[in-house]
Structure formats: C-alpha cells, structure tokens
Amino acid sequence: MAKQKIRIRLKAFEHRILDQSADKIVETAKRTGASISGPIPLPTERTLYTVLRSPHKHKDSREQFEMRTHKRLIDIVNPTPKTVDSLMKLDLPSGVDIEIKL
C-alpha cells in the first residue's frame, strides 16, 4: 500500500501568527498519532510598491511600501482518519492562508 501524505502550505503577512498556526497543526497531528515533518520555512516573498508622495508634482519625492508574505510547509505522513478529522475542526486565525494537497 502506498504511503499517504498531506502537504499543508501556510501563508501570512505576520510571521508570529503563522508560527502559532503551524504549531497548532503540528501539535494536533502528533496528538492523533501521525508522523510529521516540518514546519519548514520557505523563502519570504517581498513585494515593493513605489508611489509619488505628492498628488501631481515633485517626481523626485517618492515613498516605498513593502509587503512581506511569510510561508511555511508541513508534511503529514501516514495520517489516520482521526488526524484528518481533527485538522478539519481546527480553528486558525483569519490572517493565515492554508493550501492542502493530498
């Protein structure tokens, strides 16, 4: 029988919230008897926006805004039905984007 694997990718702008969510997922998976690898920190995506400070004049005066997207990867190997059920019921903060691949 082939090994099953659940791959969870987490994305958030705040790294503290992201790490707390990853810890909750890891704790839940370990409690239900699944083996786990991660959380693995993935490269932070940095988006830079440059805008003019004044509405129509002074092109040399600009302001830069930065948006950082932090990412983590968690692999759950050989999940039990109890693991999947408890992960579905897990309550995570609204600022965390979750992608799950089976």
UniProtKB/Swiss-Prot annotation:
Keywords, alphabetical: Ribonucleoprotein, Ribosomal protein
Assembly description: Part of the 30S ribosomal subunit.
GO cellular component, one term: ribosome
A Pfam cross-reference name: Ribosomal_S10
GO molecular function list: structural constituent of ribosome; tRNA binding
Job of this protein: Involved in the binding of tRNA to the ribosomes.
Signal peptide limits: none
Organism: Latilactobacillus sakei subsp. sakei (strain 23K)
Keyword Nucleotide-binding: no
Protein name: Small ribosomal subunit protein uS10
GO BP, sorted A to Z: translation
Family: Belongs to the universal ribosomal protein uS10 family.
PANTHER family reported in the protein's UniProt record: 30S RIBOSOMAL PROTEIN S10 FAMILY MEMBER
